[in-house]
């Protein structure tokens, strides 16, 4: 696939075309459908899913080209606001205040935006400690590690929850995102909701400098830093956890490992946000739920588009691509490539009506 064109917002210095996934089944279609090129940008957590979606959509629409730049959630939102991309991917939705204040260049003023939680995935707490593959940790301990209140792997707070694990006398290196990140916002949202006595910085996209730790750019940078370090721990979209050790988090009286099913379960018990438009399906995650089998460290990544575009050029491709992404075929393709959880039938019905109305 050719490299994406430069957007009108200066944050895009260099774009990266996605390598198409070979494992996605072709959707039904004869390949003679829509044509034209559209540009999207945003969350690096969606990269594997976007590869699957692009391949599946283009197999049915061979004259269409989808160019996606995984520059991060904040960059994607800024690029969409400025008109450098016709859709954005973000690990957090725009706030109600941002929607009211921003002038979305590509959108007809007053028509609002569409936000679909199209990618649901657990955030894995990953670590690299020799001889240890899995740990049980409660929220307060996780927060203590990332605020550096707990800085040794054999600290009693960790050891007491893992009595059968041989923990080393080794310093903990906590790795966080250096860039503005929706993954960070979701991870800190979990800490803020479940361990506010330890994590008092709130749900934020930019890591607080006072907590220190090692910084790394984007999802791949965090995974590389944890993989290549010693005694490291970090957080990343679960599709990128690989062979690293992972944490089961305490929910009620049980420790729950990450899984697509557990991520979907927490979304099902969570409401939509208040004060939003009819095509804005932002979810307020109930991270301190004690329901059995839910995994609260979850990332809901959104696809964001205009309800009505200023330019009618390529609107059919935009609508068609989003229709494929949320379809059962598209969601299955993402699940196969990225380990994400398919959206629920209720959300599919609501989102489908909104996407069909794009003009």
Show where each model-derived region lies.
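Bacterial N-terminal signal peptides that target proteins for export
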Residues: 1-11
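C-terminal motif of bacterial Sec signal peptides marking the signal peptidase cleavage site
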Residues: 17-22
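N-terminal segment of the mature folded domain
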Residues: 28-159, 223-225, 236-242
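Second-shell loop/turn segments in exported
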Residues: 36-42, 65-68, 112-113, 127-133, ...
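Extracellular/periplasmic catalytic domains that process cell-envelope and extracellular macromolecules
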Residues: 80-82, 107-110, 116-119, 136, ...
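Flexible, solvent-exposed loop/hinge segments that line or gate ligand/substrate-binding clefts
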Residues: 94, 200-328, 335-359
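Extracytoplasmic ligand-binding site segments that recognize negatively charged/polar headgroups
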Residues: 122-126, 132-220
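Periplasmic-binding protein-like
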Residues: 137-160, 323-347
């Amino acid at each position: 696939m050719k490299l994406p064109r430069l957007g009108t917002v200066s944050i895009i210095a260099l774009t990266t075309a996605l390598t198409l996934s070979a494992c996605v089944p072709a959707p039904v279609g004869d390949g003679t459908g829509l044509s034209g090129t559209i540009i999207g940008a945003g969350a690096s957590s969606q990269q594997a899913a976007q590869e699957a979606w692009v391949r599946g959509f283009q197999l049915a629409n061979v004259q269409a080209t989808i160019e996606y730049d995984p520059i991060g959630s904040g960059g994607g939102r800024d690029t969409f606001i400025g008109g450098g991309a016709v859709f954005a991917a973000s690990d957090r939705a725009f706030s109600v205040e941002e929607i009211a204040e921003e002038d979305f260049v590509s959108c007809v003023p007053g028509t609002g935006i569409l936000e679909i939680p199209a990618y649901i995935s657990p955030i894995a707490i990953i670590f690299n400690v020799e001889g240890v593959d899995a740990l049980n940790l409660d929220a307060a301990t996780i927060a203590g590690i990332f605020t550096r209140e707990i800085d040794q792997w054999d600290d009693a707070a960790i050891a007491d929850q893992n009595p059968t694990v041989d923990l080393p006398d080794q310093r903990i290196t906590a790795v966080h995102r250096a860039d503005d990140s929706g993954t960070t916002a979701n991870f800190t949202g979990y800490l803020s909701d479940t361990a506010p006595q330890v994590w008092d910085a709130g749900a934020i996209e930019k890591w607080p400098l006072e907590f220190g730790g090692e910084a790394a750019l984007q999802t791949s940078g965090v995974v590389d830093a944890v993989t290549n370090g010693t005694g490291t721990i970090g957080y990343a979209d679960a599709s990128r956890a690989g062979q690293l050790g992972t944490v089961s988090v305490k929910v009620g009286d049980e420790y729950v490992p990450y899984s697509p099913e557990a991520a979907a379960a927490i979304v099902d018990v969570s409401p939509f946000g208040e004060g939003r438009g009819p095509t804005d399906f932002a979810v307020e995650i109930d991270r301190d739920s004690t329901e059995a089998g839910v995994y609260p460290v979850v990332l809901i990544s959104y696809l964001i588009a205009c309800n009505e575009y200023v330019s009618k050029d390529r609107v059919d491709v935009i609508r068609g691509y989003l229709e494929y992404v949320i379809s059962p075929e598209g969601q299955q393709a993402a699940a196969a490539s990225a380990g994400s959880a398919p959206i629920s039938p209720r959300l599919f019905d609501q989102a489908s009506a909104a996407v069909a109305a794009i003009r």
